[in-house]
Every structure is written in C-alpha cells, then in structure tokens.
Regions:
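Active-site rim/loop-helix segments in enzyme catalytic domains that contact anionic ligands
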Residues: 20-148, 170, 174-181
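Metal-dependent de-N-acetylase/amidase catalytic core
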Residues: 20-45, 125-129, 135-291
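Low-complexity, acidic Ser/Thr/Pro/Gly-rich terminal tails and inter-domain linkers that flank the onset
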Residues: 273-301, 381-411
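Intrinsically disordered, low-complexity Pro/Gly/Ser/Thr-rich segments with frequent PxxP/GP/PP motifs
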Residues: 330-355, 442-470
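Terminal connector regions
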Residues: 352-387, 469-508
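Aromatic-Pro/Gly-enriched surface loop or interdomain linker
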Residues: 489-571, 604, 710, 728-736
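A glycine-rich, often tryptophan-bearing local segment used as a flexible ligand/cofactor-contacting loop or short
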Residues: 573-655
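Catalytic beta-strand/loop cores that center a nucleophilic Ser/Cys/Thr
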Residues: 625-716, 731-735
Length: 736
C-alpha cells in the first residue's frame, strides 16, 4: 500500500519565551523516532540565572535516557559576562551565549526559555540583583513560562541564599520559590500548579553529600547509561551539550559511566523519581526520508527577498503537497502535487520586510489524516566553503544602511581623523546619499556626500573631529552619532558573529561612537608590544594615545622582537588562553631584568592557566573583585610615579565607570610589590590586589586587575589616563 501525504503551509509567530523554530527538517533515524515515542509524561523545568548554569548532564539524562519532557529557563542571556572566544561584550556576547544555549538544547533534547532579566555583571547580593532586575517583572516571566510549559516539577540549580555565590544565582532560586508558592495558591483555586520544587544540590554546597542516601527530603539519583537508539550515553550527550558554551571555556573531556546527582525538596510533595520502564514502540515511522528547507538569496532582508521552500522525498513512497497560499510569504503551491520517491519539489515562498515574520509550518499527514507531523521552518541563507563545506545562517531583518568605525572609542586631543565605513544591504544600485554627524562635546566638519557604484556594499571615508573652541566646562567625554539626510533614525552598527559552533549572524547595536576629550599626557616615542589574550581593545586604545604598538607572537618570542620596546602588555586572560606564554616567559623575564615593563591585565584564577608562573616577581590570583562601579578608591601610594606621571591621577579618573571596578585581584604577592589602590564593595573588607607593581632588576612588572577593557570601550577618560601612566612608567627615570 502506498501512503500519500499532504502539506498545509502558513506563518506562525514564535513566542518571546519559547524556543526557536528549526532552520530545516529531515526525518529522524528510526532509533531516534522510537526514542521519541516513549510515553513517559514527566515534565521538568530547570531554572537558573545564566547560560552555562544548567546541569546539562542531568538534563540530557532526563530528556534522552528517561524520556522526560525537560526545559531550561535561563533568566538572563549572559550579556554581562566574560568572553574567552573574542572581543564581543554586552549585546553581542548575549547573542553568542543565547545561541550557545540553543546549540546545547539541540544536543540534550530539552526546550529553551528565557526570563528577560538583564545580566549587569557580577553581583554580590540578592537585594542588588532583585532591584536591578525589577523582581516583579522577572517573577511574572517565570510564571508565564511555567504556565506555558506546565511542568510537574521545577528544579533550581542554586540555593536561595548566599551559598549560591552570585546575586543572580541566589535570585534565580528566590524567584523560583516565589513563583512556585504563587502558583500553588492558584492551584488551590482550581488552576494549574506544579507538584514540587527541588534544588539540584551538590558537594559544592554540601560537603557531606557523597555518603548521603535518599530520604528526609533528599533524592539521590544515579544518572548515566547507554542509549542504543542514539549510540551514546546520556553523560556523553550532556558533556557535549556543555561544550557548546565555548565563550565560557566549558568544553572538556567527555564524561562516561555513572554520576550521582542530588535533589533537595524545597517546596511541595515528594516526587517518585524511580526511572520508568519502557516498552519498545512498534509505531511505524510517519514519513521516513523526508527533507524540507526554506532558503533565501541573501541573509539580509531589507525590503524583500526571493526565497523557496524545497521538499525532498527520499522515501520509498509517494507524498502529496496540498495547495496553500500565504500573503506574507508569497508561497504559491499548485493543488495536489504528487511527489514521487526520489523526487524534489520546490516552490517560491518570498520574504517581505513589512510582512509578519515567523516560521513556516508544514503540516504533514497522509491522505486519511494519519501520521500527523508538523514541521516549523525558519528561512536560511545557504552557501559553501571549500574547507568547512556547507554553511547555513539565519535570514535577518536588516536596515538598508549601517555605520562602523576603525576604533571602538575615539580619543580627541585637539583634533583627530576618524575612519568611517558606511555599509548598505539589499539591492545595490548606483546611488548617492548624504551622510552627516551630530557630535556631543566635539565638532564635526561638513556633511559627506557618498556615491555608491552599482554592486558596491561599503564606502570608506575619513572625517575630521575636533574639540570645540568653547566646549562645556569640565566636559571630558562625548559621543558621535551618524545620520543620513532624510532619515531621523540614527544609523546602527552591525557586529558580525562568526563562530562555527553557532549560526553566523549580525548583532545590531547603537551606532553612536564614544568620544574622550579629556586632557591626556603621553610621552612621545613610546613603543609598546602586545601579546594576545582572550580579546580586548588594548591595541586600539594604545594607538588612540599615539603609541606605536607592535604585535608579538608569544610562541616564537625572542629578545630581538623586544628590542626597543619600553613596555609589553598582555591581553586579558592571556595566561588562560595563550599557550605560547609558557615558552615566552624566560624571554620576557630576561627582558624585564634589563629594563622592560611587563603589564599583565586580569586573568582568572582557574585550572586552565597555562602556567602558574606569571612573571619575574611571584604573586597569586584570588577571586576578589569590586562590583559596585561607584565604589570610591583609596590611593595607597599617591606619590608613586605610576600614579603621578605623566598624568596626576585623582578620584575623578574613577568617575563614570561601567559594570565594575575590577576583577580577579591578586590575593598574595611578594613583598617587592607595591599595592596602589584599596577599595571594597559595601559591607566588605578593603581589597588591595587590584593594581600592584614591583621592580625586577632594572625593569618592572605590574598586575592590573582593573576592568580597563570595559572602560576603554565605554569611553571612560580615566581608563585612558591610567593606561598612559602604565605605558609611560619606564620613561619616568625608572628603567632604561
């Protein structure tokens, strides 16, 4: 008997809380299909604060081994965190970490939700977090997710107290408890309510757990086990899923065997966690060998895009496509088109910027309405690379023009030249546009006429920027915003995301450029070396100060490379990511002994350090940081040359900082070191390890845990003045 299948297509909207639609569809393996047919009805919602907080091993075991329906609710998108992959911070980092969550869910089989809370950086108190999050809004989002997903059980990753170690972590548990209690109240009035709330505890918080047994509100679960349908164990899958959090450096050796997990009942009635026993499914595969995709001619949707839906029948049976039409997509399908085995059918489904954007749904059944199958497709742009092979990326709604600059922040002494790049997308006809700038605290010359040639997507130009002769008294910073004549909306900047474990895409952010107009003195003739870390703006910041920067390869570093340099700056987290520093250490130390200045930016005190030996004078890193960016600084050595030359630093240099003062301060150091600053978050003891410096032979070594990498990008004048003093130290008569 031959089965025939019909399709119905229409647009749908994705909820802001739910998971994304699929970029394309192909029939699962028979083993995966039967795995998905298991009739276990347990639904579990796992809640934590950030991308990477979730226990992917436990989620994978529940989802893929036990057959439970699992979802993860991340209250933030992690935009306030660190990035070991590259220079992206803020909104761009949030997109990277959001996509890493989706990549993890594609492996562990869970659904992904978001809570819409802002990741404003590390927080030491739950009170600060709840205030900045607007706890009622986040609580409402948690309740909305719970009502949509309808879990039997809610599981938090963190305890609802200070043991969680981060205000965001604590707040995620506190709000989960409040949401559970409110829903329980609704349940008593006849509404839906989850049955129990557990905390996924571990020996990290309770050292005596290793010998614990189930009972007294504690459940001890043994997880792990081979899944024949997938050819992997649940721990393997969970490890691979965790490895998708590459921006946080969470890939590692694949876990196998068994693992013990602990669940502490916080609210509600105990749940029976006995693993279910399954009976092998004998249900027939609905449509084996079905493939469908929706592809467009470009990844950028400005006005409209030609696009097509393609259906490929690789099964042994015919399928049928029912006529459908959607006004937003322009999809036209002839009625009752039969698609024979081995055949491909394609029809236009164009995209329009003024239409309703969402996923295209293919509802698949046979002619008798059996074997129902719903496929939700999102449009993609497909290309290829001779090394990487097929490359797919999402189609994005895109403005016609965007602006970019050579620098993340412009330092204007008296005047400066700024290189500007005007990009355009969509159709590329020959055209002329008028570009102009509005400056706050700076003066920009006349408007720029830009003439694009047919097919030209970017125009490069330079503009003159200078301080106004009569500026605002005391103004040391400003901004520059670009417009096109006839358009009152400022141009945005597109940040390209190009990491192969997540879809390539652009992140559209505010296109205004921070400007620093403060008086910054920099000695002439400074020549500085830079060794890469995890990605920061130090080279650009130094060039803005008029410093000549030489890029150095740590793995092949020689004394000849260092000849003539007064300082060498290591990028942020260099000792966490740059293996070449192991070989470079003896060379750098010899150079310091003979008069060089080694400047080490912040590194994390983790096991991934390439070496514990971070300089010629010993010091150790701790986990101290100051997170309240308004915290006043106490100058411990106000007359030290690094505090006075060539710029006399003052409290004003710590005004306007963003997110934090510094992180991963030194916790122990040789007596040769001089700590330059002292400060503390409210209620804490003062910390002195943020900025320490010591002589070594005829040279100097400095560890600077200040968050300069954030402040340079934000246009904080004091961060540039501090940088100038760091670089100029060896010209102040303290070395060769």
């Amino acid at each position: 008997m031959t089965r025939t299948v019909q399709f119905c297509l229409f647009f749908v909207f994705s909820t802001v809380l739910g998971a994304q639609s699929l970029p394309n569809f192909h029939s699962p393996s028979e083993g995966k299909f039967h795995l998905d047919q298991r009739a276990e009805s347990m639904r579990i919602l796992y809640i934590a604060a950030h991308p990477d907080d979730e226990n992917t091993r436990l989620i994978a075991h529940w989802s893929q081994f036990n057959g439970y329906d699992v979802a993860y609710l991340s209250l933030t998108e992690g935009e306030g965190g660190q990035n070991i992959l590259g220079p992206e911070l803020g909104e761009a980092l949030g997109v990277i970490r959001r996509e890493e969550l989706y990549a993890a869910r594609r492996l562990d089989g869970a659904t992904q939700y978001f809570g819409g809370a802002a990741d404003f950086g590390y927080s030491k108190t739950v009170d600060e977090t709840l205030e900045k999050w607007n706890e009622n809004e986040v609580l409402a989002r948690i309740e909305a997710v719970v009502k949509e997903f309808k879990p039997d059980v809610i599981v938090t990753r963190f305890p609802p107290d200070a043991r969680a170690g981060h205000g965001h972590h604590t707040a995620s548990a506190v709000l989960a408890i409040r949401a559970f209690e409110r829903l329980q109240s609704m349940g008593r009035r006849g509404g839906y309510a989850p049955k129990a709330l557990y905390w996924n505890t571990s020996s990290w918080w309770a050292k005596d757990l290793e010998n614990a047994v189930s009972g007294d509100s504690l459940e001890v679960l043994q997880i792990g086990g081979f899944i024949p349908e997938l050819g992997q164990s649940s721990l393997e899958i969970g490890t691979l899923a965790r490895g998708m959090h590459k921006s946080q450096g969470f890939a590692g050796i694949t876990d196998r065997g068994e693992r013990t997990e602990y669940l502490r009942l916080l609210k509600g009635e105990p749940i029976d966690w006995t693993p279910p026993t399954f009976v092998a499914s004998s249900a027939p595969m609905p449509i084996p060998g079905l493939y469908a995709e929706w592809t467009a001619d470009s990844p950028y949707l400005v006005d409209s895009l030609q696009a097509r839906v393609t259906v490929i029948n690789e099964s042994a049976e015919a399928i049928r496509v029912r006529r459908a039409l959607d006004k937003n997509s322009g999809a036209h399908i002839p009625p009752y088109t039969f698609l024979q085995p081995g055949k491909t059918y394609s029809f236009p489904a164009n995209l329009y910027a003024n239409g309703q954007q969402g996923g295209m749904v293919l509802e698949v059944t046979n002619a008798d309405g059996l074997w129902p199958q719903t496929l939700v497709l999102s449009p993609e742009y497909v290309t290829s690379d001779r090394i990487k092979g097929e490359l797919r990326r999402p189609v994005q709604l895109t403005p016609r023009y965007s602006i970019s600059y050579d620098v993340p922040c412009l330092v204007v002494g008296g005047s400066a030249t700024l290189n500007v790049h005007l990009h355009r997308y969509g159709a590329l006809p020959e055209e002329s546009v008028q570009l102009y700038f509005q400056g706050d605290g700076v003066f920009v010359g006349k408007d720029s006429a830009v003439r694009f040639l047919a097919g030209q997507s970017v125009m490069h130009l330079s503009i003159a920027v200078r301080k106004p002769t009569r500026g605002k008294a005391g103004q040391t910073r400003g901004s520059l915003t670009a417009y096109l004549h006839g358009d009152e909306v400022p141009l945005m900047t597109a940040i390209p995301i190009r990491y192969d474990h997540i879809p390539h895409q652009e992140v559209w952010v505010d296109g205004s450029l921070p400007i620093v107009t403060a008086d910054i003195t920099v000695p002439k003739g400074l020549q500085v070396g830079y060794i890469d870390g995890a990605g920061d703006d130090a080279p650009e910041a130094m060039k803005q100060l008029g410093v000549e920067v030489k890029r150095l390869n740590a793995a092949t570093l020689t004394l000849e490379d260092l000849k003539g340099l007064t300082s060498v700056v290591l990028g942020i987290r260099a000792f966490n990511v740059n293996q070449g520093l192991v070989a470079a250490q003896p060379v750098l130390e010899n150079w310091v002994q003979n008069g060089g200045h080694l400047i080490i930016q912040y590194n994390t005190a983790t096991r991934d350090q390439v070496t514990d030996h971070m300089g010629p004078v010993p010091f150790k890193l701790g986990r101290d940081r100051v997170t309240v960016e308004e915290t006043p600084a106490t100058f411990l050595a106000p007359t030290h040359p690094m505090m006075t030359y060539p710029n006399a630093l003052s409290e004003a240099d710590f005004d306007g900082w963003v997110q934090e003062r510094g992180l991963y301060f030194a916790s122990e150091w040789d007596k040769a070191f001089v700590p330059l600053l002292e400060w503390a978050d409210p209620g804490e003891t003062p910390k002195q390890g943020a900025w320490i410096t010591a002589p070594s032979g005829e040279g100097q070594v400095t560890y600077c845990g200040l968050s300069l990498f954030r402040e340079w990008r934000a246009g904080v004048p004091g961060a540039y003045r501090i940088l100038a003093n760091l670089l100029a130290f060896q010209t102040a008569g303290h070395g060769k």
